[in-house]
Curated annotation (Swiss-Prot):
Role: Catalyzes a cyclopropane ring-opening reaction, the irreversible conversion of 1-aminocyclopropane-1-carboxylate (ACC) to ammonia and alpha-ketobutyrate. Allows growth on ACC as a nitrogen source.
Residue positions where N6-(pyridoxal phosphate)lysine is found in the record: K51
Reaction(s) catalysed (UniProt annotation): 1-aminocyclopropane-1-carboxylate + H2O = 2-oxobutanoate + NH4(+)
Family the entry assigns: Belongs to the ACC deaminase/D-cysteine desulfhydrase family.
The name this protein goes by in its record: 1-aminocyclopropane-1-carboxylate deaminase
Subunit structure as annotated in this protein's UniProt entry: Homotrimer.
Native source species: Pseudomonas putida (Arthrobacter siderocapsulatus)
Activity versus pH, per record: Optimum pH is 8.0.
HAMAP family: ACC_deaminase
Active site: residue positions: S78
Effect of G44D: Loss of activity
Length: 338
């Protein structure tokens, strides 16, 4: 496998830390050891997150092409768009963000706090759009790029989750290589890796990266899209393409992609009672914050897998904390009593 042939523009502090979740592990019976890899604090750029790791492999292309404007898309509380806005500010580029109405959630401050507030503070041109949630290329995003061209700029397109970009999976191939190095320092290997999946490139990169040591099927994606067929197909497509890019040496098959669909309900962006319990439990036991859209659902999934005995006793499980806590303010009504 050869990731080093791709140029990387450093936007993170370096390897994100792996920390034990001792109190949560003990609360759940102590038979499974839980750890977290903290992508939520991987950068000094507006709290970082998993998209910052991905952007390290996209930005060299933007610089090489002489682009002056990063154009991206997401929901109103998109972590992706906040991270793109931060990177644009860091590089001295302009930024146009299309923020679609992906979540059926009403709150008076939903479009004024959290991620979208930070994007505005960082100087992004934020455009609200009424379109609902879907995965893939969006007309509103294409129009935003056309607008940049019409006013004499040169846009660089960054799709939702970086996932439709040819290099969207590379960052999390790097994640797997980083984990392998950290495992040497820890003196053990993780038996399972749990990660939230929506647009697919995070899990796709992990599948490829861990396929290099035979652990692709140990990457357990927890769907948060509530459109699991689309998500799984996208993970597989991106993983196959990424495997070719890095010369993995074998084909990625459907069996390599494990996606748990039990925890996404009722729909994208809306938490269920299990999500909220997981957010409160992890916060109160570990001081680690997760969000109602992504990490709360994957944390719920991991907690339930432990409770149901789905991990063998003695397993060491790595939770990939991808970020997302900045969106908590947009859901403040749900936590008005804690």
């Amino acid at each position: 496998m050869n990731l080093n042939r791709f140029e990387r523009y450093p936007l993170t502090f370096g390897p994100s830390p792996i920390t034990p979740l001792k109190r949560l592990s003990e609360h759940l019976g102590g038979k499974v050891e839980l750890y977290a890899k903290r992508e939520d604090c991987n950068s000094g750029l507006a709290f970082g997150g998993n998209k910052t790791r991905k952007l390290e492999y996209l930005i060299p292309e933007a610089i090489e092409q002489g682009c002056d404007t990063l154009v991206s898309i997401g929901g109103i509380q998109s972590n992706q768009t906040r991270q793109v806005a931060a990177v644009a500010a860091h590089l001295g580029m302009k930024c146009v963000l299309v923020q679609e109405n992906w979540v059926n959630y009403s709150d008076a401050v939903y479009d004024r706090v959290g991620n979208i507030e930070m994007s505005r503070i960082m100087g992004a041109d934020v455009r609200l759009d009424a379109a609902g949630f879907d995965i893939g290329i969006r007309p509103s995003w294409e129009k935003a790029m056309s607008d940049v061209v019409e006013r004499g700029g040169k846009p660089f397109p960054i799709p939702a989750g970086c996932s439709e970009h040819p290099y969207g999976g590379l960052g999390f191939v790097g994640f797997a290589e980083e984990v392998r190095q950290q495992e040497k320092e820890l003196g053990f290997k993780f038996d399972y890796i749990v990660v939230c999946s929506v647009t697919g490139s995070t899990q796709a990169g992990m599948v490829v990266g861990f396929a290099a040591d035979g652990r692709s099927k140990n990457v357990i994606g927890v769907d948060a899209s509530a459109k699991p067929e689309q998500t799984k197909a996208q993970i597989l497509r991106i993983a196959r393409h990424t495997a070719e890019l890095v010369e993995l040496g074998r084909e990625i098959t459907e069996e390599d992609v494990v996606l748990d669909t039990r925890f996404a309900y009722p729909e994208y962006g809306l938490p269920n009672e299990g999500t909220l319990e997981a957010i409160r439990l992890c916060g109160s036991l570990e001081g680690v914050l997760t969000d109602p859209v992504y990490e709360g659902k994957s944390m719920h999934g991991m907690i339930e897998m432990v409770r149901r005995g789905e991990f063998p006793d003695g397993s060491k499980v790595l939770y990939a904390h991808l970020g997302g806590a900045p969106a908590l303010n947009a859901y403040s009504f749900l936590f008005r009593n804690g």
